[in-house]
């Protein structure tokens, strides 16, 4: 038995609520206990495991706890080097991935870069953009600044048991908050080409 405790009204906050509700139902169909809009107030070691006390007063008796409570860029070294840290807490870089010190470049989860949709500073904790940044950065360091990084719209895909969930762009919640008009499309299709085994 697995239980998921989430402070938000949905799991996978980067996806729109309509997609998250499909994930919620899939969790339940697999026997996962889902506790939304809940918070953990205490962990109590007991003889045969751990009691997880929730804000509502519910106590979950578990063998193991896995904490996944967000991501923050590790910018300690950048601060010590005197590099500029942006409003999101990431290392501020220009289009060539240079930091505030022109001889120091930065890439990956630790950088802040304008989101191509909103124009606002953002972080992208994804392997795809980090890989692209690394290639652009290496080219710029070796050959001079001629490759520009244009940002990431944060396309992400996750496997939830046998369900594939993906999203691209900003969520409806974020676009509403930023007052950016948008159109959305929700597609329930195959996760890979039909001629592959298991399609």
Question: How would you label these PLM feature ranges?
Answer:
Residues 38, 95, 108, 186-188:
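Residues at the C-termini of beta-strands that transition into short coil/loop
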Residues 45-50, 101, 197-199:
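A short, glycine/Asx- and small/polar-enriched loop/turn
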Residues 110-199:
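Mid-to-C-terminal Rossmann-like scaffold of FAD/NAD(P)H-dependent oxidoreductases
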Residues 33-35, 105, 183-185:
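General small-molecule cofactor/ligand-binding pocket signal
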Residues 31, 88, 101, 179-181:
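A generic structural signal for alpha->beta connector loops
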Residues 51, 59-139:
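FAD-site-proximal beta/loop scaffold in flavoenzymes
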Residues 2-93:
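A Rossmann-like FAD-binding core segment of flavoenzymes
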């Amino acid at each position: 038995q697995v239980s998921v405790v989430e402070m938000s009204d949905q799991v996978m906050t980067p996806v729109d609520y309509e997609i998250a509700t499909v994930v919620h139902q899939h969790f339940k169909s697999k026997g996962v206990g889902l506790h939304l809009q809940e918070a953990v107030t205490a962990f109590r070691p007991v003889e045969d495991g751990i009691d997880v006390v929730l804000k509502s007063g519910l106590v979950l008796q578990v063998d193991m706890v896995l904490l996944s409570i967000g991501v923050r860029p590790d910018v300690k070294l950048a601060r010590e080097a005197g590099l500029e840290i942006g409003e999101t807490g990431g290392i501020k870089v220009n289009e060539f991935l240079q930091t505030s010190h022109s001889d120091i470049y930065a890439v990956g989860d630790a950088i802040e870069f304008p989101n191509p949709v909103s124009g606002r500073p953002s972080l992208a904790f994804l392997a795809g953009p980090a890989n692209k940044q690394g290639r652009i950065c290496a080219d710029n360091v070796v050959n001079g600044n001629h490759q520009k990084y244009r940002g990431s719209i944060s396309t992400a895909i996750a496997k939830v048991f046998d369900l594939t969930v993906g999203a691209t762009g900003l969520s409806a919640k974020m676009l509403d908050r930023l007052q950016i008009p948008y159109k959305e499309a929700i597609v329930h299709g195959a996760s890979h080409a039909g001629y592959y085994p298991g399609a």
